[in-house]
Each structure stands twice: as C-alpha cells, then as structure tokens.
C-alpha cells in the first residue's frame, strides 16, 4: 500500500515595520495618559496655596515648595492621634492582611488543586459562588463573627476578614492547576517529602507570578482602605481615614491634603514596581525551561 506523504508547513506570523511603529506609538500614548495623574498629583503637592486655586489652573507648579509636606506633618503632630500612629496602623493592616491572606490562600489552593479528597469540588464551587457577593452583603455576618471573637475595635477586625477573601484562593488554585505538574509532585512524594514541604519548596516557586500578583492586589486594597465599621476608636484608624479628615478641612488644608495624597500613593507604587519586575523576571525564566 502506498503511503501518502504529508508536508508540514510552518506558519510564521509577522508584522510590518509600520504595524510595529503604530503599536509602539499607541502604547506610548496610553502610558503617558496613565502617568499624567501621578505627575499632576505630585505637582499639586508642590504648589503654594495661591497656585492651587489659580484660574485657569496650571498643570505644573510655577513656584514649587515643600511647605505642604511641612504643614501636613505639623498638622498631624498636633492632632490627638499622632501621624506615626496612623501610619503604623495602616502598615500593620496592609502587611498582616496581605501575607496572612497569601499564606492561607496558597495553602488552601494547593489542597484543592493537588490533593484528592471527598468534597473538594463542592468546596471549590462554593468559593466560586462567593465571588459574586460584595463585602457589603456580608458586613453584618462579619460584624457578628468579629464581635463573638471580641475583635471589634482592634486591628484584627480588619486583618482577619482580609485573610478570608476567596479571590486570592481562586487565583492561586487556577495557577496551580495549569503550572504545577502532578508528575513533579509524585516524584517528591516518592522521595518521602511531606505535603507541607512540597507546597513550600516546589509548588510555590512554580506559581510565583500568581502570588506576586496577589501581593500587589491585596496590599493596594488594604493600604487604600478607609474607615471600617469594626473600628470606632481614633487610635486604631488608618491613614486613609486621616486624609479624609484633612480633606474635610476645606481650602485652608488643600495643600496638606495634596501632600497626603502623594504619600498615600507612593507606597503602593513602590510595591507595584518591585513586584512587577519580579513577575516579569520569573515569567521570562520559566519560559526558558523545557
């Protein structure tokens, strides 16, 4: 019987030089539009009070001055709760909530994705269903739980609910399903490794882009969170709440409010830049593996 020979042709996708230039120009324009609000916020924080209310408004400060930052620190230091206390509360909420959520979400995601046990699919469907509910809907239930554990009016009342967010669990589970191969885990189990060791030393490095993305998202959300229904004492309020009080001061506090906005914006940007570079580096190195 004669054999039919088939010839395989490689399909090479290529763009013209004009197409590359057009895409580059479009990305540059979009990047400039995304960067302009940050530049404007910094410019506003450096303007003296008379320039803040100048008409027509200027984009850049004509006579830049750091007095707004000085006024901000003086204002916060003369308040009943010092400036450092608001910053400390925000850092504790952001760091504690982020890393606690990362630990629990990745551990539960590993169990749902790579350990076979009865009810795993039902649990994951429950996680998927919970994504449809806004936090406002569950606020009363969360308040009752926090009250039962005597966590009302403490930082734990904000940190612990952040641990229970199901979005990070869903993200980590999906990444582990596609990027962590069962053959690698089975080899580790045959070598006598425990599940907790496999999760930490094998699974977590394989999904590094996922948990770095989770850190960025969770940290920014907690850092920018304002007043909470679980906290009513002034000494446990966050920095975002303090900014709201400064902004409510009106025209005379406009400069200090602009300076506070820059400080509030700076930390998430730094976290994003550091984590984003690690994400790109990790994805680039993982793409070179066989």
Regions found by a protein language model. Name each.
Residues 2-290:
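A hydrophobic, multi-pass inner-membrane permease signature
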């Amino acid at each position: 019987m004669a054999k039919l020979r088939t010839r395989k042709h490689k399909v090479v996708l290529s763009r013209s030089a004009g197409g590359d230039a057009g895409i580059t120009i479009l990305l540059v324009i979009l990047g400039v539009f995304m960067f302009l609000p940050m530049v404007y916020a910094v410019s506003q924080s450096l303007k003296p009070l008379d320039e803040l209310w100048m008409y027509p408004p200027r984009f850049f400060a004509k006579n830049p001055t750091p007095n707004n930052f000085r006024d901000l620190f003086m204002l916060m230091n003369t308040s009943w709760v010092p400036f450092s206390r608001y910053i400390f509360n925000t850092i504790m909420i952001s760091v504690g909530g982020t890393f606690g959520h990362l630990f629990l979400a990745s551990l539960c995601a590993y169990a749902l994705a790579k350990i076979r046990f009865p009810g795993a699919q039902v649990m994951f469907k429950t996680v998927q269903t919970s994504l449809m509910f806004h936090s406002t809907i569950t606020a009363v239930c969360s308040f009752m739980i926090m009250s039962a554990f005597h966590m009302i009016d403490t930082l734990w009342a904000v940190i612990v609910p952040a641990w229970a967010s199901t979005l990070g669990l869903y993200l980590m589970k999906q990444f582990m399903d596609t990027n962590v191969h069962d053959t690698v885990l089975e080899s580790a189990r045959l070598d006598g490794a425990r599940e907790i060791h496999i999760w930490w030393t094998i699974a977590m490095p394989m999904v590094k882009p996922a948990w770095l993305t989770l850190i960025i998202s969770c940290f920014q959300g907690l850092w920018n969170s304002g007043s909470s229904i679980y906290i009513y004492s002034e000494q446990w309020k966050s920095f975002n709440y303090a900014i709201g009080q400064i902004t409510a001061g009106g025209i005379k506090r406009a400069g200090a409010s602009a300076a506070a906005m820059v400080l509030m914006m700076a930390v998430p940007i730094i976290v994003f830049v550091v984590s984003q570079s690690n994400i790109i580096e990790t994805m680039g190195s993982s793409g070179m593996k066989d």
